[in-house]
């Protein structure tokens, strides 16, 4: 939702207008923002049963006569793309933001493997947030540069890489936000704060993050870990923090809509994910000038500035050492650098 809304806020809505389709029970849809910008919203039944979902979506797409549909559901996009094809939507974009998961998510990986060819079959255009996400979904041939060897008819099937864009001004560092957030969360201004923002799930690997922070505390007692988000693993991670005896040094904020303020309060950003496409939180954190530690499962394209490192998911001690070395080394001009990098034409 966040990536799509970033584009929607910035786009010329007199030229292009969005309608949003989401599942019944979706929790993070910014309804008021969409209404204020002239967008319409349609609530869909869940995929189960799939025929009901397909009939409902096909009817709505037919009635509204869209020029373009843009799907962000990874391999599960095969169903809405099929509905769009049947409804006569001429341009159907499959936009991938992810790769495959770890061993704990074998059932999800199997589903992705089975659905992937059908998602590609029903799309007319391929998008991805990074080369890693593109290669996983579309294969090496689709991500290769265009050349005369390729059939001109198939050129539209090449992948368009669309990095997850953000409002750089919003995420620039603010001393005022830093003081305010620390006061709100009752964190001393002198503390070293390590931050993490993400859904609590196997992909984000928060269990390993807790192990990293235990090692950090052995060397720097005044450290605090802020973990922001919700998800199916949240209670499991809370229990792990309690079992480690560090609950007085860890702050769970729940879901927040002010990530820009949180980044200013952090001294270092940690993202030890098991897999990623191009994490927008990593872009935001670098824009705020933070030194960031990402796992090497994250695409190298996430290293936008010189303040991000990719580390293997090995020993928590290695991560702790790297985090302590870079904590507090903030680049307060990073927002301007990120803006320049994002807007500079490719060679």
For each predicted feature, which ranges?
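Short His-centered aromatic/hydrophobic patch
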Residues: 71-77, 95-96
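Carbohydrate-associated surface elements
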Residues: 132, 165
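A short helix/loop element that forms part of the nucleotide-sugar donor recognition site in Leloir-type
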Residues: 142-150, 172-187
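N-terminal strand-loop element at the rim of the active site
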Residues: 2-52, 145-152, 232-233
